[in-house]
Curated annotation (Swiss-Prot):
UniProt domain Response regulatory: residue ranges: 2-118
Species assigned in the record: Pseudomonas putida
Gene assigned in the entry: exaE
DNA-binding region(s) in UniProt: 167-186
Residues with the 4-aspartylphosphate modification: D53
Biological process terms in GO annotation: phosphorelay signal transduction system; regulation of DNA-templated transcription
Protein name: Transcriptional activator protein ExaE
SMART domains linked to this entry: HTH_LUXR, REC
Single GO molecular function: DNA binding
Lineage, broadest ranks: Bacteria, Pseudomonadati, Pseudomonadota, Gammaproteobacteria, Pseudomonadales
Length: 214
């Protein structure tokens, strides 16, 4: 199973398809220019991942995602959009998306996100995930209230740990030592009143930052 790109701009589809094909060792990449075309293509051949834009002619990317997930709950959708307002990010996740990227994301981040979502994980671009953690979600439980007591760096470490990022990679990406990451983990468990990594993941899901894999 390959990837289906859903975007109404042919040049964006062409460039992204070429980039992903090279970066993912020739994984097949198909294209759709509208929500209706995406629904038809998925019906004909199930992809491993749908990369979705918000703005589409006809039915929107959000509505397309809802329809796809209603028909195929196991289908994984990653939003790739120039619109990064937190309300829209939450709408995408509520519609069933497994991740969200801005079109301004670095190429390496795009590849990482696609690989992680294909592997069954959730992925929200780091700046967006941090903003989501800091802003309460109407109707959510107490997850966000606890997170608001964290510093910016603690939120970054928390989100990376919750997404399953190895300690070594967290240290590299944040330019700190592995020992410092371990210290942050101990501090986070104390501040958030959890005792295990599984509870950290549960808290991230409760706060609306991660979705349970379908």
């Amino acid at each position: 199973m390959g990837i289906l790109l859903v975007d109404d701009h042919p040049m964006i589809r062409l460039g992204l398809a070429h980039f992903l094909g090279e970066g993912l060792n020739g994984l097949p990449v198909r294209e759709a220019g509208s929500g209706e075309e995406a629904l038809q293509q998925v019906q004909e051949e199930l992809p491993g991942l749908v990369i979705m834009d918000f703005d589409l002619p006809g039915i929107s990317g959000l509505e397309t995602t809802r329809r796809l997930r209603q028909r195929l709950p196991q289908l994984r959708v990653l939003f790739f959009s120039e619109h990064t307002e937190l309300g829209l990010v939450r709408q995408a996740l509520d519609a069933g998306a497994c991740g969200f990227l801005s079109k301004a994301a670095a190429p390496a981040v795009v590849l990482e996100a696609v690989r992680r979502v294909l592997a069954g994980h959730a992925y929200i671009e780091q700046p967006l995930a941090t903003q989501l953690a800091c802003q309460p979600h109407p109707g959510q439980g107490g997850g966000n209230a606890r997170l608001q007591g964290l510093t910016q760096r603690e939120i970054e470490v928390f989100l990376m740990l919750a997404k399953g990022t190895p300690t070594r990679l967290i240290a590299q990406q944040l330019c700190i030592s592995a020992k410092t990451v371990s210290n942050y983990l101990t501090l986070l468990k104390s501040k958030l009143q959890v005792s295990s990594h599984a509870e950290l993941v549960h808290l991230a899901i409760e706060a609306g930052l991660l979705r349970i894999a379908a």
